UniProtKB/Swiss-Prot annotation:
Its EC number is 3.1.11.6. One of its GO terms (biological process) is DNA catabolic process. It is an enzyme of class 3 (hydrolase). Disulfide bonds: none annotated. Heterooligomer composed of large and small subunits. Keywords: Cytoplasm, Exonuclease, Hydrolase, Nuclease. NCBIfam families: xseA. The gene is xseA. It comes from the Bacteria. It catalyses: Exonucleolytic cleavage in either 5'- to 3'- or 3'- to 5'-direction to yield nucleoside 5'-phosphates. This is Exodeoxyribonuclease 7 large subunit.
Length: 417
């Protein structure tokens, strides 16, 4: 058997290890960690009985999403590398995540797929935000920095809004139940005089475990069932949670939620100032133009002696009015004379006609009196009647009875011949 040099055995070990362990996943606890000024990260990963050195170069370190601390339990994805001169090996880290995040990521993706199939993310279900909200329900921790950030931004942008804080657990045991309970409480005012225009669900950043309540199905159900528009403002811009997909609007940060929701009063004041300045400028321009037009008209009047011509026209009108009055008086006098003549003529004819009617009346009265039955009876005349009807003597047969009547008496008679 040929004896191998140390460098040869180390080289063979390097070849075997690096070709065999090209893609590995190792779980362990960080025992120490150093971030070099070059951007490289050096750490030691250990378990109860062993340890191994690890390095993450600058290129991969830029994509690291967690802050590495001693005592953290992590999962490292990478490959083995052997340093031949010293016969040492280490893990070249491609990614480092907190242990347990693999299971959480799988649960996250499974719930996301399930809710997507149920239509929880459909844009048709999204409710629009009010343009000028008056009442906001804020669901966050009363002691968290997120609350202070949101209130500060809200006061700066639109201090007319009324914000009601629902103190909510946003991490740890009971967080999901607290979120669901307060969502339902805030939404229960919908349709009343104390209803909220929008609900803001917010908290600052943190680890996936800390933020997991916003990936719970019961929270998604409560958001989807709410009648009040909801903004999900959870974590940082790079963090995306199930609540972000289900909510009507997703804000990248809690502060951004208030910027999205509330108008900027300073911007509105600036626009108002621009409108007022534009209005006054236009008014000033109109005033200048009208003043110039008035001055031109004044000069025009002077040029054509409008004042003298106006006075002459007034004098002509006065003369014409006098002529009209004189003419009307003459016509009126002529008409009055004609009327008086007609009246006298008509009066004479009426008197003549009245006398003629009086004469006719007296003549007819004499005839009437002569034919009056009472007058005839006084002269011995009587009326003949048969069966209650007046008749002539020639209408009565021989031996037929009839009545003779005057104004006071009536007797039965018989024709004898």
């Amino acid at each position: 058997m040929r004896a191998l040099e140390v460098s040869e055995i180390n080289a063979q070990i390097k070849s075997i290890l690096e070709s065999t362990f090209m893609d590995i996943c190792v779980r362990g606890e960080i025992s120490n960690v150093t971030i070099h000024t070059s951007g490289h990260i050096y750490l030691t990963l250990k378990d109860e009985s062993s340890s191994v050195r690890c390095v993450m170069f600058k290129g991969n370190a830029r994509n690291l999403k967690i802050k590495l601390e001693v005592g953290q339990s992590v999962l490292i994805m990478g490959s083995l590398s052997v340093y031949v001169p010293k016969g040492e090996y280490q893990i070249l880290c491609k990614s480092i995540t907190l242990a347990g995040l693999g299971e959480l990521s799988q649960a996250y993706e499974a719930l996301k797929t399930k809710l997507g199939a149920k239509g929880y993310f459909e844009s048709a279900h999204k409710k629009p935000l009010p343009r000028f909200p008056k009442r906001i329900a804020l669901l966050t921790s009363a002691t968290g920095a997120a609350k202070e950030d949101m209130l500060k931004v809200a006061h700066k942008r639109w201090n007319l809004v009324h914000i009601t804080l629902f103190n909510t657990l946003v991490q740890g045991e009971g967080a999901k139940d607290s979120i669901v309970e307060n969502l339902k409480r805030a939404d229960s005012f919908f349709g009343t005089s104390e209803s909220f225009d929008v609900i803001v669900l917010g908290r600052g950043g943190g680890s996936m475990e800390d933020m997991w309540a916003f990936n719970e199905e019961c929270v998604a159900d409560a958001i989807y069932s709410a009648r009040t528009p909801i903004i999900s403002a959870v974590g940082h811009e790079v963090d995306v949670f199930i609540s972000d997909f289900v909510a009507d609007v997703r804000a990248p940060t809690p502060s951004a939620a208030m910027e999205i929701l509330l108008p900027d009063k300073n911007e509105y004041l600036r626009v108002l100032d621009e409108i007022m300045n534009s209005y006054f400028y236009a008014l000033k321009q109109q005033f200048v133009l009208k003043s110039q037009a008035l001055e031109r008209m004044r000069e025009y009047f002077k040029l054509y002696n409008f004042e003298q011509r106006y006075c002459a026209k007034v004098e002509q009108i006065n003369i014409f009015q006098q002529m009209m009055r004189d003419s009307m008086n003459a016509v009126l006098e002529d008409k009055m004379l004609k009327y008086e003549h007609i009246f006298l003529s008509l009066n004479a004819r009426c008197e003549e006609k009245l006398q003629q009617c009086q004469y006719e009346y007296e003549r007819m009265l004499e005839v009437f009196n002569a034919l009056n039955p009472h007058s005839l009876s006084t002269r011995g005349y009587a009326q003949i009647s048969k069966e209650g009807k007046p008749c002539r003597l020639s209408d009565i047969d021989i031996n037929e009875e009839f009545y003779l009547s005057d104004m006071t008496h009536s007797i039965l008679a018989k024709r004898l011949q």
